[in-house]
């Protein structure tokens, strides 16, 4: 499966395309409103 590289901004509609997890500025859990505004980035696999 194609996936986005680490440090790529992940939005709510594409967070499952990260190679690892989608991490937000306020912690490891991607909250919907943070993902809508582009505050989250792909991170390493857990």
Curated annotation (Swiss-Prot):
Top-rank taxon: Eukaryota
Compartments it resides in: Secreted
Database matches in Pfam families: Toxin_28
GO molecular function, one term: toxin activity
Cross-referenced InterPro entries: Insecticidal_knottin-like_sf, Toxin_28
UniProt entry tagged with the keyword Disulfide bond: yes
Tissue distribution: Expressed by the venom gland.
Chief site of localization: secreted
CC annotations in GO: extracellular region
Cysteine-cysteine disulfides: 3-19, 10-22, 18-42, 24-40
Keywords tagged on the record: Disulfide bond, Knottin, Secreted, Toxin
Region (Keys region for toxin activity): 31-33
Domain notes: The presence of a 'disulfide through disulfide knot' structurally defines this protein as a knottin.
Family assignment from sequence similarity: Belongs to the neurotoxin 16 (SFI) family.
Biological role stated in the UniProt entry: Insecticidal toxin. Causes flaccid paralysis followed by death when injected into Heliothis virescens larvae. Does not induce any toxic effects when injected intravenously into adult mice at a dose of 1.25 mg/kg body weight.
The protein's name: Mu-segestritoxin-Sf1b
Organism: Segestria florentina
């Amino acid at each position: 499966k194609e996936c986005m590289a680490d440090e790529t901004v992940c939005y709510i509609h594409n967070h499952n395309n990260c190679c690892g997890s989608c991490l937000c500025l306020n912690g490891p859990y991607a909250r919907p409103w943070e993902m809508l505004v582009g505050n989250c980035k792909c991170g390493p696999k857990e």
